Amino acid sequence: MATQVLIAHTGQRLEVDTAQFSHLDDFKAWVGRNTPVAPKHFVALTPQGRTVKHASLYAEACCPSQKEIYIYDIRMSQAPSSDGSPSVVSQVPPPKRYSIPNAPNSIENVQAIASWQELYKQRRAWAVHLLEDCSAMDATARARFEEMDVMIKCVDAAVANLELSIKQIEPKYTELKKWVEPALEEHARLSTSWQQYLALARNTPVSPSMVKFMTRGQASKSNATLEDLIEPDTAKKAGTLAPTAHRRFNDKATELDRAAKKMYQTLDALIADFDKLMSRSVLGRSDESTQLLQDIEAVVKQIDSDYRTALSYSGSQKDVAQASKTASNHTERLVPNLKKRAKEMDDLLQYVTTSRNTVASDAVEFMRAITEITSLRGKLKDNIGILNQSEDDMTTFDYLRLIQQLPYMYASFLVEAIRRQEWNEKIKADSSTLANEMALFQDEEAKRRRRWQKMVGSTYGPGLDTNVIGLEVSVLGDDNSWPSVNKDELVAFLAALKDQETEEAILEDVGRLIQELNSPTKQQSKRLKAFKNGSVHEAALGRSGLMIRGDDELLRSLQDDKSKLESKLKTAESRVRRLEDLLHRQSQASRPGNLFQPQTNSIHERNDSASSVKAAPTDRQRASSEGTDTLLRRISELENELREEKQRSSRIQNDLSNRATQHDDMKNQIREVNSTKKDLLENMEALKREFVLERKSLEDEIKTLKARLEDTEDEMEHFGESREKERTSYEERAQQLEAELERIDKERRDEMLKAQGQVDFLRNENRIQREQRDTLERELQNTKDAGHATSKRLEALQEAADAHLQSLKELHSQLTGNDPVPDDGDLADVIQTKAADLLARLQNMESDTSLIRGDLDRTRDQVKELREELASTKDKLATEEAASIHVRECVSEEKAKVKALEHELAETREQLSRARARLADGETGSETLQKRVEEEEKKVASLSEELASRQSQVGSLEEELHLYKEKQEAACARASELTQRHETRDERSKELTQRLYSQNDRLCHLLERLGYAVSRKEGTMTITKVPRAERAAQNPNDSSDPGTSLRKSGMLGAKALHESADLDLLYWWNSADAATETEKYAAFMSKLGDFDADLFADTIYHRIKEVEHKARKWQKEARSYRDRAHIAQKDAHDKIAFRHFKEGDLALFLPTRNQQAGAWAAFNVGFPHYFLREQDSHRLRHREWLVARINRIQERVVDLSKSLQANDSASINDEENDNPFQLSDGLRWYLIDAQEDKPGAPATPGMGKSTVAANNVEATANIHTHMAGAKGKNRDSVHSIEGINKTLSKSLESRRSSSSSKRALPFAGAGAQALLKSNPIASETNSLRAAAPETPVATSPVQGGLLSTGEGGRPQPGAAGSSSARRPNDGPGEASGNGDAAKTAEPRRMLDRQESTGSPTKKSVVWDPLWSVDYTYESPGKK
């Protein structure tokens, strides 16, 4: 499952497989590449609010949903700075209001059906365009909802993290609070009452010996008090410092409470604000855009359906009327409805965007509040640490507490001294008693032995009398250092404390010590509790050290007798109670009913009778006779009734007595049950108390471990900060080293300049060396030519090995450029990594492109504004130039006027001078001349003023002209700068356009090389996977370039860059006017520049996930196969192997025939030539078989040439003979060192089982690779005897280099028995012998199995000549013929085996005892 990565402040949602990150820093780097969150500002949390660690990157969630990781930027929690740094708050600009175009509503001819169809077509196009715009708005709205959801989830996780951190510190604060409040009260009491405690200690007398013992002999006063146990100076100093320490401790506790209160209040406010945010969340309206889009789609489908229906109309009047009616329906109902839904979609988009920006701002505020609460938590934690580390204050109050607890301490020492004294006395008394008792037992035993020896033992001699074993009791250790104290001193000490008005708590503690001194010990309590329900529980009683001679049986019999007597006593008491009850009942029943009833009736009768006698004597006689009969009857009736009542009363009494007995028995049973239930309840209560105590201790331990875990996490965080600081120092050091390197580089350049003078001297030497080098190069060329042939051969061999890697390497080269290709095993992982990097680069490039597009738009707007400003500036400049020209003309006119005035003034002055001269000469009258002079002077003054004003006006105009010139120059400079900036941005836009195009082209080529085809239709990019058959069918013979076998994309990869017709769009900026440029840019973005990065990412992601799924599947299968292999290996460890022999296997070794003496081979199927190295411990001469465990296997090849050379040179080497068994040349065989697994096994298989010689094993070669009917056709085949003979008769060199010697060659045909003795393979199948004549061959059904006729191999049980039809499941030795061996062996070439179908009554004289021995051997380890 991919992991969802959620960015808190932007609302982004990314997907990544965290298994590719080996460290958390890699994940940080990936986040930094794909998001604006830098690694140094990186914070990651899980949905539960826990910090993401390296181990949690690989931890998969238990639920099937995807795992999520929340990423935060720590700059979110920082207050906004005033230095102009960019804000972290992600604000999306509100979209422009969507202007709904009017629907087409004009028709040329209402009577022509074609006009109506054209109107329907235009309305359909209008509706489709509106649907596309609404779809885009729906996608944008859903994206905004998704961003809000991500932001709220991240805030929720941050709040959960804050709650977790506060919950971690809360137990510490609670525990500290429980301790602080009583501590403050105690400190206040100690700081005010310490003098009272000191006075109590000063006035309380104690035992001098005990004081001397407690102070280690430092205090030895005769009249000792409790004050002697402390130092008065230290006590006074502690009492002086106590108020200050108490005030300081109280201040710390108050600060702790204040910090905790502020933290909890802020946390409650934060949670309340978050609940408000959740309650007013707009996520509940996330489905509105989809519903609106569905409504719009329904309307558009209706319009499209009407359009298609209108296409089928003919030109009839009815169809025209129907078309008009449908168009009216569109105009009145569908078109307004569509506009209304589009307007609602636009309003929803505006609302969602505003809500998203609000949530983003609220999220940042929440993060800042969380940071503030976290700082308060850190302050609270520091306060807790400060309060816990108040050692000086605690030391002061500890000493004062010691002064307070002096009576208790002294009493505890007294109690301990009394207990130790009692223990010593008990040990001495019990040891003496035990010694005396054991001496009596020893004496009794000695007397008994003497009596027995005298009566019986002396019969066989006097030597049977021995000493009686005795017991010596000795007491170890000496505990006499404690002073002698009795209980009276302790009671007197308690009375002295009561007399001085000591605190009740101290008196209770001392009284409790005295009570504990009188309470029984644990063993005594156990013995007291042993008596339950009138019986003794031995488990609770324990064992006594002074039992009578330690006779458990005697003690048990006595206890049984006691229980029997107690049961008899209970029975007797029950009977006595029953008899007493019966006696009481009988006495109550035998009493008369009423002894004092009145006799009035009888007297009255007698009176009546008397009167009657007197009255009538005759009647009396008659009445008396009748009354007598009546009375007799009445008496008999009453007697019968009395007898019945007595019987009924006796029955009732018996019933009552029985019921009373049953009631008593039931009461006794209920009493016993209640007592048993009471005991059980007490036991359960005790267990409950133990469990509660254990649970409390475990909870305390859990709290302690959680606190330690939190401290450890804090230390890890501090360690990370120290790592950051260390890395910063390393970076500074690297900068210093770079500066040093630059300095060294500069010095090196200086040295190079200095060394330039030496170059000329070295050139001559270089020339000489060049000549030598040429010589060496020629020699090297010769060597290269010589090795060229070898390299060609190596290249030919390597081409076959590199063919299957070429496609991956080409893909790697396309992805990575010039990077080196990794190893074969890492190539797929590298390609995955590169694909992920390309995806990240594409996303970064798209984000950069979007930014650059925004910059480009802004730049265009600025350029446009600057151009407008430049035009306005030019207009102003032209106006100013015209004004300046006008001013210049005015100035020139004024100058001309000034010159004229000056000329006129000069003339006037000349006239004045002449007038003055004339006046002087007396030519005219003085008055007239004076008037003229005054006039001329006034005229001159006015002209001078006018001249001055005109000159000042000319100066101001010149200054204004100079100012306009400066403005013109500044505007020209700004215009040139903007033009240059615009050209620079144009170049950058060209570069970005080309890079975007090339990146899109490369990504399309990457998709094509990965087996996908890219196509575009109606502005939508589609990526489809090319089937493997189509990829293979395009170019099946070309395996060098995997890209050529893939279908080319229809988007960018169909043509080369210089051949594509769409390349004109790539140069969209080379346009004559702005409209053409805008049109080309839009066409470029729709055709070449638009690339669906999300679809590309999903495709690459799914492809990688498919690869990972296959890898996990294969890994799981490999793990299951490995487990099965381990199980099979474990099962096979104690079973006899018959193939794939290796060290540690059990093997069955059998002697061979027609070989040198001592040739024993391993029983095998398809793995011949495994011979046993004989050892003295094997004792092979006395065995018929050997089961041994392989210690070592040596592989050897028979080389007869070495033997011939050794014979020719007549030299004998000390080396071991490589052909001790006389095998054929070139044959590969194996020498096995084995150790018998069960030394001491019987030398013979069993009684009556062996009927052949020790070295003769009877078997038959009955292997067929073909049917019996095809024997004549395959005589020259490789698998026939002739083929084997030809193969074995090859040259020595070819036989050594062939691989046919590595496995056994099966042979076929019934005549193989005769051929085995007349060809070379007879020496290599010496373990097989011709079958008996009566054994039928090739008549049994074919069975699948593996069988070998290896040289020196064991006989094959599937073809044993003397064996008949085998019993099923005879033992492990028969695994050579069934499928069980194939389950644990590697797949080999299977041969068809035909078993012999001899007589079912015939038994194998060799294998039956072997299987029985094998079964006995493996029976202990059978699984």
Curated annotation (Swiss-Prot):
Residues 585-602, 650-660, 1034-1047 have a biased composition (Polar residues). Residues 551-589, 625-978, 1102-1130 form a coiled coil. Disruption phenotype: Impairs the cytoplasm to vacuole transport (Cvt) pathway, pexophagy, mitophagy and non-selective autophagy. Enhances conidiation and significantly reduces cephalosporin production. It is a peripheral membrane protein. InterPro entries: ATG11, Atg11_C, ATG17-like_dom, Cleaved_adhesin. The keyword Coiled coil applies. It is found in: Preautophagosomal structure membrane; Vacuole membrane. Pfam families: ATG11, ATG17_like, Cleaved_Adhesin. The keyword Protein transport applies. Residues 631-648, 1383-1395 have a biased composition (Basic and acidic residues). It comes from the Eukaryota. Residues 583-660, 1028-1048, 1327-1423 are annotated as: Disordered. Its main location: membrane. One of its GO terms (molecular function) is protein kinase binding. One of its GO terms (biological process) is reticulophagy. Keywords: Autophagy, Coiled coil, Membrane, Protein transport, Transport, Vacuole. GO terms for cellular component: Atg1/ULK1 kinase complex; phagophore assembly site membrane; vacuolar membrane. Belongs to the ATG11 family. Homodimer and potential homooligomers. Interacts with ATG1 kinase and the ATG19 and ATG34 cargo protein transporters. Interacts with ATG9, ATG17 and ATG20. Involved in cytoplasm to vacuole transport (Cvt), pexophagy, mitophagy and nucleophagy. Recruits mitochondria for their selective degradation via autophagy (mitophagy) during starvation, through its interaction with ATG32. Works as scaffold proteins that recruit ATG proteins to the pre-autophagosome (PAS), the site of vesicle/autophagosome formation. Required for ATG9 anterograde transport from the mitochondria to the PAS. Also recruits the ATG19-prAPE1 complex to the PAS. Required for the Cvt vesicles completion. Plays a role in morphological differentiation and cephalosporin production. This is Autophagy-related protein 11.
